[in-house]
Amino acid sequence: MKKSIMTVLMILFISSVNFASEDLQVLDIYDYELVDNNIDPFFKAVIKGDLETVAKMIEDGSDVNLRIGGKTPLMYAARYNRADVIRLLVGKGAVVGAKDNQGNTAMKLAELANAKEAMEVLKEMS
């Protein structure tokens, strides 16, 4: 009986550890980000590079300079190399020189991610 209880407790503990680890992604030894499955739909469309949805959401009133976690949609578009989304956001008034909580601009985030297209577009639009 004791073995059965201990086995069940170990399985529950291991399951909860695996569940918790899904919410944290280690990008490298010095960087990490929390993965939020309840991410704002506008930011999700930006990250995916869904230009049509981003345009529609802006038309419906989404703020191109909204911040989540200190970052703007433009910063996410730059980090994920979404050149067309960058053009759209800047065309609709996104602030190119805005800084996140760590002092990074969209250009710096593109550089850190080696997002070459994003860097080119941001240079053109600055």
Q: What annotation goes with each model-predicted range?
A:
Residues 35, 67-68, 100:
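Ankyrin repeat boundary/linker residues
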Residues 52-53, 84-85, 117-121:
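Conserved ankyrin/ankyrin-like repeat signature
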Residues 42, 74, 106-107:
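Conserved hydrophobic residue in the first alpha-helix
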